Amino acid sequence: MKEYKAIITDFDLTIADTAFLIEDCLYTNAARFGYDLDRGILRDGIGMTAESIYLDAGCSAAEAKRLHDEYIPYSAEIMREQTELYPGVADGLASLHAKGILLAVLSLKASDQIWRPLERAGVDKYIHSVISPDEVEKHKPEPDGIFYLSEKTGIALEDILYVGDSVTDMKTALNAGVDFAAVCTGAVTADQFAEMGAEIIHPTFADLCRAICAEID
């Protein structure tokens, strides 16, 4: 594995154990308005916008937009205060930072829903940037978030690694022209990532961090 100057990571299901929180918020938000949606479909959509997930769950475009607009404030406090990082992530981020690698998070979430869990875990000091919808207009799988960090830091795209757990994450890296590392803490398996052409695949973010640091050592 080559040495990278910057690593950008997805948040949900990559470094943060949020599968149940997101699924439950999507479901209970819709239930407030009389919808009984398939939890499996909601869970499989994690990584996309709430509007896209509600569309996949069978809502009309107007219904999906309404539920999306209600979901944002409904879920905000829950995500800020109940999100926890996966085991080993804190140590992994510390190790990467100690190696001089610039670290950033790219997510569809508002930045405070990311910074607060990072602060609670004591790892916010390792993160250079959180790239949220506040920073870029076009979201994953569009490459704008990765371009934003490259332009902000002056780090070339060939020196950036993007890490994620989903097909959307892989498409984002491909669209940006950066290397991609898959972690299998989401819905996509290692075999599925390999079939799609992923070359760097690890069970967890912590495993990936250990592999990167071992290469530098």
Each model region followed by its residue ranges:
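Acidic, Mg2+-coordinating phosphoryl-transfer loop and its flanking beta/alpha structural elements
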Residues: 161-200
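Structural recognition of alpha->loop->beta junctions
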Residues: 122-132, 192-209
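Short acidic capping loops at alpha-helix termini that bridge into adjacent secondary structure
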Residues: 37-41, 62-63, 124-129, 157-161
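N-terminal helical cap/lid subdomain that shapes the substrate entry/recognition surface
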Residues: 2-90, 95-99, 115
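Substrate-recognition/cap helix-loop segment adjacent to the acidic, metal-dependent catalytic center
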Residues: 30-33, 52-61, 82, 97-104, ...
